[in-house]
Amino acid sequence: MKLLLLALFLSISASCLAEDITKISESRIPNEDAVPDYEAKWRLGAIQKLWNERRKMGHTPMTKFSPPGFPNADIFFKNETATATRTLKHRFAWALLLWAITEGKVTSKTSAVYDSTSGNTGSAEAYMCTLVNVPYYAVVADNLEKEKVKQIESFGGKIIKVPVALRNAKAKEFADKNHGFYMNQFGNAEKAEEFHESGDFYFESTNVYHEIIVQLKKDKEQIVKIPDYFVHSAGTGGTISSVGRYVARYGAPTKVVLSDSQYSLFYDYVIGHKFTNQSGAGIWTPPGIAGIGYGYDIEPVWYGETTSLTRNVIHEAMKMPDIASVATMRILDEKGYNVGPSTSLNFLVSLYKAYQNKARKSAIKHRLTIVTLACDPGDFYRSTYLNNEWVEKSFKKFGGVMGMECWKKLIQESIDTGSDFYSKGLTMCPGAFKV
């Protein structure tokens, strides 16, 4: 009897809760707006502003570096510091906000956009949100460089400081609490980043590899029109994945190489599919290389949630000692390249690819062409990576300034003569490299 009553109750409950289809009748023709007029008007206006920004962005310039020690190799920097916010994240934030508005994640009623950032995405998101009149809050580490804080604020962003490991969780918490939208650049980059060719279409693709191909094609002095290697690090993983997807989709003969920092988990995530069930707690060693790598987060590497790095479109991955990247930053600074530590890491991996191709007598017969990105300016790091006191304290385990100078000498020697800086550095320079 009890079971019969329970079944009757559940049946009645289900019928009460069941949704009914909208019916066509002589008194009603179903025809309503899915999006209110005022919202459609706001969305159209916001998207038009973003496309106007894309046109102003144009193509960031490319600069060729030809190391004397590798006479058959060219390393191109695509200079993303030429954007309005001076970083690679300008085009990325543009893509993120365009995605969020297009999908209705950000609307005219959104109280604010919140995101976790190490600085560069924050300044670019602040710029883009200000462009469409949506308030923006950057949730940053409590020890973020003062130069980056100033940069975010200069574009209209507000700063919320938290412990670095809590940035993602706190950004989501603040967004939920204040009826805002958590952009989650790490999880949503793969949804937002463009990876299609656009030809001469009026609304041109923002894919950085697309621009590279267009620029090399137009350069009459450039014989090699398609790069042999594209080298880049990963923060969200969005940029390098968008390039990898583009290369795979169109069958381009370019190898996509992930450059990773010393204690980052990305190398092992890509090569061995590790750390999908384990965080980097106890592995990550600060300061690392600003803006890139994975390890300080309290969560494992979860695709679509904590990262957008698409491992299946990466051809190679390579790690470099952090102190060597710092040394490279000093070399590039002295040569007039105003670039940050992630750019220096990219260059270092590019230089080693040139060495490998020379040492292995590669089958590549034409002039080896490597393209990497100049991600942000060295100006942001005058108080850190370009400051000897900070280097001495932060990289004490690797010899501090003395260790940096050791690597600097070997890397400069490689640029000049084509020698192997990596093997020499691991044996000759201070640090815990001996097994």
Curated annotation (Swiss-Prot):
The keyword Signal applies. Glycans are attached at N79, N277. The modification N6-(pyridoxal phosphate)lysine is found at K89. GO terms for cellular component: cytoplasm. The keyword Glycoprotein applies. Residues 1-18 form the signal peptide. GO terms for biological process: cysteine biosynthetic process. Keywords: Glycoprotein, Pyridoxal phosphate, Signal. Pyridoxal 5'-phosphate binds at G235, T236, G237, G238, T239, S342. Belongs to the cysteine synthase/cystathionine beta-synthase family. Highly divergent. This is Putative pyridoxal-phosphate dependent protein F13B12.4. It comes from Caenorhabditis elegans.
